[in-house]
Amino acid sequence: MKVVALFLFGLALAAANPSWEEFKGKFGRKYVDLEEERYRLNVFLDNLQYIEEFNKKYERGEVTYNLAINQFSDMTNEKFNAVMKGYKKGPRPAAVFTSTDAAPESTEVDWRTKGAVTPVKDQGQCGSCWAFSTTGGIEGQHFLKTGRLVSLSEQQLVDCAGGSYYNQGCNGGWVERAIMYVRDNGGVDTESSYPYEARDNTCRFNSNTIGATCTGYVGIAQGSESALKTATRDIGPISVAIDASHRSFQSYYTGVYYEPSCSSSQLDHAVLAVGYGSEGGQDFWLVKNSWATSWGESGYIKMARNRNNNCGIATDACYPTV
């Protein structure tokens, strides 16, 4: 009788929630049993209601971005924050980029169009954002120096950049310390030779398959969006850290993201600033995330610029030297 009841419950789920069935199909969701599915459905419906109510504000012109169902829509915000972040604040560098010189003003910069940015990647349910931000910065600088865009191994950083560098694999890490590891190690392997696994594993670095090297890093003047803009324009893609803890970030879809309750000091996620511009009168930073192309604007987010360092985007920014 219990089996029949559960079967009927499953049929009822499918009939009553076509958006749920679409979500499961699109993202390949299979749950252990119907009890877990019922729980995930309730989470999904709660997120769906939040998204629909938020998007009404967007339609009324009260906010500058909208939300959508994505691969995180069956996660509570607490679960999302527990598994999808991983940034730890690193040491302040000896070298600091402070230039805000009067070079010809650029209203828009997009390093993707210049070939300095690899395709969007996916960290999975592993707190390795720090590794993706690190490789993104090195990939960009390596391209600008050599003319060759090489996708680099985040898995090597997850597996090998612990120990005296204090990174903790899928439990988080520091961009600056990861860069120091690459410098001291003599390089980082290519993605193709050391592919990503979204889990902690033993170190398998191979000096014969190094894709890029670096000599150190330079920090951006803390909290200065002006210095960050100049660095993004003149240097290339910049590793940045942000507060990505809010439900609005979890479900971001398109538009210029401004979150009034964002912190400029409590940062939990490392990403890559690859440009800047304006949209509908709103200045933004163009930011590459590591949550696959199904999140945001094909894996990117436009984050508010010149809004008092919203979400801390200029609080802890740096780039590698190569």
UniProtKB/Swiss-Prot annotation:
Keywords from the UniProt entry: Disulfide bond, Hydrolase, Protease, Signal, Thiol protease, Zymogen
Signal peptide from the UniProt entry: 1-16
A GO BP annotation: proteolysis
Positions annotated as active site in the UniProt record: 129, 269, 289
Protein origin, superkingdom: Eukaryota
Family annotation (InterPro entries): Papain-like_cys_pep_sf, Pept_asp_AS, Pept_cys_AS, Pept_his_AS, Peptidase_C1A, Peptidase_C1A_C, Peptidase_C1A_papain-like, Prot_inhib_I29
UniProt keyword Disulfide bond present: yes
Disulphide bond pairs: 126-170, 160-203, 262-311
Record EC number: 3.4.22.-
Gene Ontology MF terms in the entry: cysteine-type peptidase activity
Pfam families, A to Z: Inhibitor_I29 (PF08246), Peptidase_C1 (PF00112)
Propeptide: 17-105
PANTHER family per record: CYSTEINE PROTEASE FAMILY C1-RELATED
Similarity comment: family membership: Belongs to the peptidase C1 family.
Official protein name in the record: Digestive cysteine proteinase 1
Native organism: Homarus americanus (American lobster)
